[in-house]
Every structure is written in C-alpha cells, then in structure tokens.
Amino acid sequence: MGNNRFMVVSEERGIIAMNPSYIEQKGKNLIIYMPGTYKQLELEYKTEEEARSVFDDIRKAYESGKIDVYI
C-alpha cells in the first residue's frame, strides 16, 4: 500500500496496524498484512457487504492520504 503514513485501528479488537503492506477481503473477513513481517491481522464481520464497505473505506482513505481508518 505504499509509504504513506497510514494507520488501521479496530477499537473493538484493540488492533493497530501502522502502514499495512497489503489488505485483502476474503468473504466476511479482512486480512491486514503487517509490513516487514509475516504477521497478519484478520478481522471478521457479520456480512460480506460490511467487510466490503470497510475495505472500500480503507482503500479510499489510503488514496486520499487520510491518516486513520477506524474499523
């Protein structure tokens, strides 16, 4: 996802991911890959549509240069 300053936060799950290297959607789950490691965070949503909506929010935030995305 580039070198922009970017953060993904899930207050419900206590997750913070600085500059995620890659994010993908698999069904009802979002997979957030951490930079410089083989670690990943998996967030599960109630529906695929909800997961898609959050994925789109993250993509739009990244493209617009926003700093934080709250999940």
PLM feature spans:
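Eukaryotic intrinsically disordered, low-complexity regulatory linkers and tails enriched in Ser/Thr/Pro
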Residues: 1-71
